[in-house]
Amino acid sequence: MSESKNQTNEQLARHNPFRQATYLKGAAELVQLPADVGIEVAFAGRSNAGKSSALNVICDQKSLARTSKTPGRTQLINLFTLDDQRRLIDLPGYGFAKVSLEIKERWQATLSQYLQHRECLKGLIVLMDIRHPLKDVDQQMIQWAADVGLPTHVLLNKADKLKQGAAKNTLLKVKKQLKEMHPDFTAQNFSALKRTGMDTLMHRLLSWFEYQ
């Protein structure tokens, strides 16, 4: 690990700005969101990708984002404030929700509108299970972001479930496919359980939130 990343880890150990995240509200519709000002970074992913666990690790809080035993059950945009100008956005899990086609289509429309028209949205984190990356629904989310040039970073979560060589090969394949969708989109291996990949992710988040 480079000296600069070691320094970053030490700085975060002393002051992680995401520790101050607090739950603001859950929005069922875009009109329920706060005013379109400040900075928002959104987290998206299939219902079994480990999105809630990743948010809890990033914010160093055990139960900030509640993990559901029924994947896809909660269809709300959950907002967490860092300060009066910065918000983390937890988008509804997609892919396994046992809901009607009408509800799924409505939420697809809501998510696409949020990603493509929210002016204060500065970045999108897409979480995937490294063992099942880039499913059709993942690619749809990424394509919506690509259409408007929204900076996007993919977390291949649960990297601890694969051997190092297999994890590296999967990452290379995902990076190649991402480049075909948008040349500036990036990806990394990550494990919320083992807290691996935190330094790279934190650099990305701190930059988007203009902490550095």
Give the label of every model feature segment.
Residues 2-98, 211:
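Conserved G1/Walker A P-loop phosphate-binding module
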Residues 18-30, 161-212:
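Canonical P-loop GTPase G-domain recognition
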Residues 33, 71-78, 92-122, 130-144:
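Switch II of P-loop NTPase G domains
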Residues 40, 60-61, 104-107, 141-145, ...:
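Glycine-rich, phosphate-binding/catalytic loops in enzymes
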Residues 41-49, 54-55, 70, 78-81, ...:
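Structured catalytic cores of enzymes that bind and process phosphorylated ligands/cofactors
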Residues 63, 73-76, 103, 107, ...:
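Helical mechanochemical/support elements of P-loop NTPase systems and associated helical scaffolds
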Residues 73, 86, 93-96, 131-134, ...:
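Conserved nucleotide-binding/hydrolysis micro-motifs of P-loop NTPases
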Residues 112-185:
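Conserved C-terminal guanine-recognition region of P-loop GTPase G domains, centered on the G4
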